[in-house]
């Protein structure tokens, strides 16, 4: 299945929101700090690459990728 640019963007935005929520809950970070952690990560850069297909994975899996960076 091929996604349109709009569909891809929607999936990335939803995954990003889930990641920020997971960072806040699991790492007890404030929202600004969680945003900073997610948006400055290699995982987020990979999420923006359609070829990585991270947007198809579960938020828990992508969060584990984010945790593995540290």
Regions found by a protein language model. Name each.
Residues 1-70:
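C-terminal alpha-helical interaction appendages
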């Amino acid at each position: 299945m091929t996604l349109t640019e709009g569909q891809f963007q929607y999936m990335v935005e939803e995954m990003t929101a889930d990641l920020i929520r997971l960072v806040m809950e699991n790492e007890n970070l404030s929202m600004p700090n969680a945003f900073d952690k997610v948006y400055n990560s290699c995982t987020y850069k990979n999420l923006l690459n359609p070829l990585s297909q991270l947007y198809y994975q579960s938020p828990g899996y992508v969060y584990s990728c984010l945790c593995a960076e540290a």
